Amino acid sequence: MKKILIILFLFLSTLKGEAVENPKIILKTIHGDVKIELFKDVAPNHVNRILELSKNGKYDGVAFHRVIDGFMAQTGDVQHGNTKNNFNPTMVGTGGSDLPDLKAEFNNIPHERGTLSMARSQNPDSANSQFFICFDKAPHLDRQYTAFGKVLEGMEFIDKIK
């Protein structure tokens, strides 16, 4: 049986002075903490969505429901993937938040080890709350999915997700 991994985000930084830095968050897993930088400069709407859902606790207790070894680990189904509230193993991976879907913000961030990118359906403008973290290079996703962040520390904990 698959281990269920839960996530929790904590904010690390706030705006300092006039210079705007990309926000950093902590993704807490059962294996350890993962420090992530969010690229607000290239995917502002997607980063704002992640921050909003995080701030409101929507990701707390949400499982990594799809893991493809050597490719990626996917999480963020706040509707069906919350292990603390209404977890639905037959529906996990099909839900999103109650917020509207986001328009694509495709960019030049490469999908490589540690890249965070939004999951979506075949419709490029269907990203909502689900996202994935790449285990390795995935150039076939470049400019096809909205990359919005990068693991800075703790990728070894993502590698333990099975």
Stretch-by-stretch model annotation:
Residues 4-13:
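Sec-dependent N-terminal signal peptides
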